[in-house]
Amino acid sequence: LVTSDAHPGLVRAVSEVFQGAAWQRCVVHLMRDCARAAGSRQLSRRVSRIVAPVFRLKEAGAVRAAYHLAVDMLGSCCPEAAAVLEETEPDALAYLDFPPSHWKRLRTNNVQERANREIKRRSRVVQVFPSASSLERLAGAVMCDMDEAWSDARYFSEARMAELYDERQRGANGEPLSEEQLEGFRLVARQAIEASLQLADMLEAA
């Protein structure tokens, strides 16, 4: 699984270099794209309040139900944001195919964003580069340092990685969800989004 924003060049590079890998669209960037589609600041805040709770839910069924509900709710107040959300569903929810304990690290590209911030921080010290190659050397040095740090660190423990195998085994033998289970997920989804909107209304009224 490769996680990134939806920049066309990145998406194309992932498909060419990591053939067969799934692609996860960073949900933070997705929420920003939805909010940007709203136009006005007030509507943008409402869009964010509808979308954000979707990715905080802890069960895959509830996340999917909330995603569909968010698309429906956005359709009545901001069709542009609804179109963005609906179009990207398979890529935005790719992380749900992995164990829940992995979700927090898979659904955003925070690791890459931290690397970008470090390059910006180091380049601000220099301010003016004499050539493009000097900038490339600095960025390359930063990435080499990070690669060394990442190679010594364990992102997931062995127990967490074992969960992935167990999850795949259960998925292969899993039963489809009943209508009662689906309705329960829809209820959880509605409660989560409505609670987020109520909190927003209370904060604006205060």
Where in this protein do the model-derived segments appear?
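Catalytic center-proximal scaffold of phosphoryl-transfer enzymes
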Residues: L1-A206
